[in-house]
A protein has these predicted regions:
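N-terminal prepro-regions of secreted/extracellular proteins
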Residues: 1-47
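Post-signal peptide N-terminal regions of Sec-secreted extracellular proteins
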Residues: 33-140
Length: 140
């Protein structure tokens, strides 16, 4: 093998290795892609339906309180953190309530469901003392 061929071979291996490492970094840093997601909080539940980008909440208890959901969005392009961009609630009637919100891929979203009040932050859970749960981060 000539010196030039060996150099080309080493360069090709280095390029392949670099692209493999880059692919692994992207794969591990990405949020989950959107699929249907359900959050059960015992008093009711919330579901994100990917086909149509619908957010549905259902109150399953006749306790005088409702089930409240909120969608939070964190843009990849600004550093202001998560913002609540949509709310939906259900309580006191038959069936569930739902609302659409277009989920894109320029940031991450989380859907939070609480019993008795609207969520105020993107990762509220029962372990934090709230009757809430969330989907975790996702996008299209």
């Amino acid at each position: 093998m000539t010196g030039e061929m060996m150099l080309k071979s080493k360069f090709a291996r280095a390029a392949a290795m670099a692209s493999g490492v880059a692919a692994m970094v992207v794969a591990t840093a990405s949020p989950a892609f959107a699929t249907n997601k359900t959050v059960d909080i015992g008093y009711g539940y919330g579901t994100f339906i990917d086909d149509g980008d619908l957010f549905k909440v259902c109150d399953t208890q006749k306790d005088g309180k409702g089930v409240y959901g909120a969608v939070f969005y964190n843009s990849y392009f600004t550093t202001s953190g998560y913002k609540r961009v949509m709310t939906v609630s259900d309580g006191g009637d038959a069936g569930c309530d739902q609302k659409g919100y277009d989920i894109g891929n320029s940031g991450t979203y989380t859907f939070v469901v609480c019993w008795g009040f609207y969520p105020t932050s993107p990762f509220m859970t029962a372990s934090m003392g709230y009757p809430c749960s969330h989907t975790g981060e996702f996008n299209e």
